[in-house]
Swiss-Prot record:
A single cellular component GO annotation: cytoplasm
Name under which the protein is recorded: Transaldolase
Pathway: Carbohydrate degradation; pentose phosphate pathway; D-glyceraldehyde 3-phosphate and beta-D-fructose 6-phosphate from D-ribose 5-phosphate and D-xylulose 5-phosphate (non-oxidative stage): step 2/3
Protein family per UniProt: Belongs to the transaldolase family. Type 2 subfamily.
Pfam family, one: TAL_FSA
Protein encoded by which gene: tal
Role according to the record: Transaldolase is important for the balance of metabolites in the pentose-phosphate pathway.
Length: 374
């Protein structure tokens, strides 16, 4: 039976779920999304884990065991999150095998407090990879300037990487270069390049949220006509960069050696403004060799009424450039916006991580008290 999500998959878009919890793994809800809505991967981030662990009861037994072992909060969070990701990797093992590792992938992010620490990120990436112990795990590394070298070194060690928090075209080019350097290093180190997978997570809706605020402040007809267009335009131009770099001679040499391209991944695809169609960042960003990671609400909307009408990216680059040029013409600085979004994105993840640590610390204390009373 043809469905909206199966049509999206047929158009070249891998559907990943931007959510994970132990309850999803044990209740069958994740399996249902795999079976019915063509989900072929999962992404996580500090905010997702913070929400899952603070709201659910599925973690109480493990927290009690960790408290009995005298685990500190950092070790406890590491064990809880890597266990969830390892279990999710098992859910997707069949898809990973069938797709030769391109899909069936589960992402786990390095501690966001290390986003500005190159060596700390490299060490954490290797530790997470070893702890999860699954071939289909992606280690998420933020695309900070300090993260670029960490991306190269992690890939060079043969570890698959999801580069996250990309907002600008300039940074995206730097990320692709870090990827190419990493694959070249992996080749020199003797790794099987066909086993190294990478995606570059380009954030979409947050661009509109910030730029729309500035357009609203201008309150002109031209400003109003540009609302809700920047995020899609920015992502489409990122795909143009992808097409350009991955048809280059430099890439051809690596592809001959078995390397696989780093696919663009559309992240932050939940629509924030109710005035826009709730599938905007799905149906307007369809092209071969991309991933779209969706919150469940967006996935449900896509399955229900997301009309897939072929490739909606290629050949629309002049239109996309026109949007960004018009914004600059109104005095809205692209570079200022993307720098702010990176800063805010990292701050949100660090805040969520600290909330997660606080919650698990409280749970450990409570479990230890109960243990001493029994």
């Amino acid at each position: 039976m043809t469905t909206n999500t199966s049509e999206l998959s047929a158009a070249g878009v891998s559907i990943w779920l931007d959510d994970l919890s132990r309850e999803r793994l044990t209740s069958g809800s994740l399996q249902k999304l795999i079976d019915e809505k063509n989900v072929v991967g999962v992404t996580t981030n500090p905010s997702i884990f913070q929400a899952a662990i603070s709201k659910g009861t599925s973690y109480e037994q493990q927290v009690s065991e960790l408290a009995a072992q005298g685990a500190d909060v950092e070790a406890a969070v590491f064990q809880i999150t890597t266990q969830d990701v390892a279990n999710a990797c098992d859910f997707f093992a069949g898809i990973a095998v069938a797709s030769k590792g391109v899909d069936g992938r589960v992402s786990i992010e390095v501690d966001p407090r290390k986003a500005w620490d190159t060596q700390g990120t490299i060490e954490e990436a290797k530790r997470l990879h070893a702890a999860v112990g699954k071939d289909n795990v992606h280690i998420k590394i933020p695309a900070t300037l300090e993260g670029l070298e960490a991306i190269t070194e992690t890939l060079g060690a043969g570890i698959s990487v999801n580069v996250t928090l990309i907002f600008s075209l300039g940074r995206y080019r730097a990320v692709i270069n870090a990827f190419l350097l990493g694959i070249e290093k992996a080749k020199a180190n003797g790794h099987d390049l066909s086993q190294i997978h990478s995606v570059a997570s380009f954030f979409v809706s947050r661009v509109d949220t910030e730029i729309d605020k500035r357009l609203d402040a201008l309150n002109t007809d031209e400003a109003k006509s540009l609302k809700g267009k920047a995020g899609v335009a920015n992502a489409r131009l990122a795909y143009q960069v992808f097409e350009e770099v991955f048809s280059s001679e430099r890439w051809a040499l690596l592809a001959e050696a078995g390397a696989l391209p780093q696919r663009p991944l559309w992240a932050s695809t939940g629509v924030k403004d109710p005035a826009y169609p709730d599938t905007l960042y799905v149906t307007e960003l369809v092209a071969p060799n991309v991933v779209n990671t969706m919150p469940e609400k967006t996935l449900d909307a896509t399955a229900d009424h997301g009309v897939v009408s072929g490739n909606t990216i290629s050949g629309r680059y002049d239109e996309a450039n026109g949007v960004l040029n018009a914004l600059e013409g109104l005095g809205i600085s692209y570079n200022e916006v993307v720098a702010l979004l990176e800063k805010e994105g990292l701050e949100k993840f660090v805040a969520s991580w600290k909330e997660l640590l606080d919650h698990v610390q409280d749970a450990l204390n409570s479990a230890a008290t109960k243990g001493s009373e029994s």
